[in-house]
Regions:
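Hydrophobic, small-residue-rich alpha-helical packing segments that form membrane-like cores
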Residues: 1-3, 9, 21-25, 46, ...
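Short linear interaction motifs
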Residues: 4-9, 73-77
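Repeat-blade elements of multi-bladed beta-propeller folds
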Residues: 14-44, 70-101, 115, 119-143, ...
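Beta-propeller fold detector
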Residues: 1-3, 7, 55-63, 68, ...
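Beta-propeller blade signature
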Residues: 42-53, 101-105, 109
Length: 169
């Protein structure tokens, strides 16, 4: 976070911006998110794996005025990491719990998309990347835009060399 503020958490004092979800390592960079409440600030970080030296930080997406999932409401909200981060050649993907994952440019940290209201009742903390898609909550979303591409049904998904396998039952 932006300073050393602490608060009680799990019977001890913790950062007001604790690391959230699971970090992802790709090539020589570690990506992770920190912060719980969008209004207090959420930060997506990229660090050089060997030294811990910051490559970039995105601090702009924790509190954005965006459409909310309840009928025409707009309010300050934003990306809040809830799940294991994903990365590919171009993007860092941040699962956000009850909303479709957010995307950031992997090289610069620039925010690309987050659709809180648009895909109502879709989203989840478990996500996967396969080809040009983000698999999340029984759906495939285009990784370039975050737009819904297909609904494949709920159940565990796994990426295979020839596509996606989904379990049911």
């Amino acid at each position: 976070g932006p300073n050393d503020r602490k608060l009680p958490g799990n019977e001890r004092m913790i950062s007001a911006w604790p690391a959230r979800g699971g970090p992802v390592v790709l090539e020589d960079t570690i990506y992770f998110a920190a912060g719980i409440w969008p209004t207090d600030g959420v930060y997506v970080h990229a660090l050089e794996a060997a030294t811990g030296k910051p490559r970039w930080v995105n601090s702009e997406t924790g509190s954005m005025e965006i459409n909310q999932p309840h009928g025409g409401a707009r309010a300050k909200s934003g990306v809040s990491s809830q799940g294991y981060l994903l990365a590919n050649e171009k993007q860092v993907i941040v699962p956000t719990g009850r909303a479709v994952p957010a995307a950031f440019n992997r090289a610069t940290g620039k925010f690309e998309f987050y659709h809180l209201q648009k895909n109502q009742k879709r989203g989840g903390s478990a996500a996967l990347l396969v080809d040009q898609f983000i698999g999340n909550s029984g759906c495939l979303f285009d990784s370039a835009s975050g737009e819904l591409s297909a609904q494949i049904g709920h159940g565990p998904m796994v990426a295979m060399p020839d596509g996606i396998v989904r379990a049911s039952g």
